[in-house]
Amino acid sequence: MSIRIIIEIIDFLLWIIIAGNVFYVLFFALASLLPKKKKTLPSSIIHQPSTLSHRSSFLVLFPAYHEDAVIIHSIESFLHQDYPRELYHVAVISDNMSEETNQHLASLPITLLCPNFEKSSKAKALQHAISFISQHTSSAYDYVVVLDADNIVAPDFLTQLSKIAHPSMAIQCHRTAKNADNDIAALDGLSEEINNSIFRKGHNRIGMSSALIGSGMCFDYNWFSSNVNKLDSAVEDRELEALLMMQGVHIHYVEDILVMDEKVSSTDNFQRQRLRWMTGQVQAFLQMLPSLPKAIITGNINYIDKTIQQALIPRSILLVLTPTLCIIATLTSSIYHLPSIIYHLKWWFTLALFIIGLYIAIPSQMRTKVVLKKATVLPRLVWRMATNILHIKTSNKEFIHTVHNK
């Protein structure tokens, strides 16, 4: 076999992988532009508004690991909900926080739990909270809400949730940046909004389940309490997604209910966060793969889609990898006199589609020169992400903490 044929085979295989990733991004970016239908949920779970005789009750969980800098402000802010006080209860799972912080929290009208885990994780915190609440309270809740320690929500957060919550579906609220104090934080916020367009809004627009994002999540209490003990990794949101998809529970994305979330503002924090995500993505893919044949046979489109999501190349790496391969293909085509129209032009066309897809996914209010100029830090961040690949451990269940300060 000649060198030219080997090069063409490698080129084609690489292009298939990259083009598949690009098509996924472009397809759901375009889907996010579709008008919001009055009836966006599957017919089996169309919500009937609550009657006046019953208003939903909520258990609100704040897992907090080394979150002394932000947790008190978040809890005090949340307690200003305009929802009836007797219909919601806040529980903070304080893990490795100071005595001073715990004393302050204990003075508030909440439940403070202080577990002592050998190895901390958000999943363990949620499991501990549900176990304690179910054993020590006679209250029956309709829904459980999961928020991060740095999250800030509007006073009508629970009121708005109560209008759409349904036992047969999970809800993912619109998590958005509460800080953009430097280029890294701004870029992290931009990345999250692109994800919202592609993995949440775009999916819901065509009747598919949204992706979860780790906080701003709402579940039926009975479902959550029955499934939370199945969580066994450092990326509980991906595990929850898999459980929901296997059980046919729809995830509804609510764009109008905002959850303000602190974005990482340092390269070290960015690297830690992305390492956790990349490790979790690989772990989730390996966990979901065995059930994929059954999903294909039964036509479980949402489970198939979620499995594909775990196999996607991280977008910022793809943004650097694709033009690099374009240049390599162009040089190789010139050196070996390969037919350009079937060799390097397909790469440039794929890159153009990728850029178009990303641009479409950026909310219109963020398409400014100021925001786009902040992308100058991207090469440094991509390099950090690339080095993370060397540290991915498929069996590692250790929690990688992201520091919050705002």
List PLM regions with ranges.
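N-terminal membrane-anchoring/stem segments of glycan-assembly enzymes
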Residues: 1-49, 364, 385
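A conserved acidic beta->alpha catalytic loop
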Residues: 91-102, 116-119, 152
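Long helical/loop segments within the catalytic core of UDP-sugar-dependent glycosyltransferases
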Residues: 114, 119-133, 158-232, 275, ...
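Short aromatic/hydrophobic "clamp" motif used to bind/position activated sugar donors
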Residues: 144
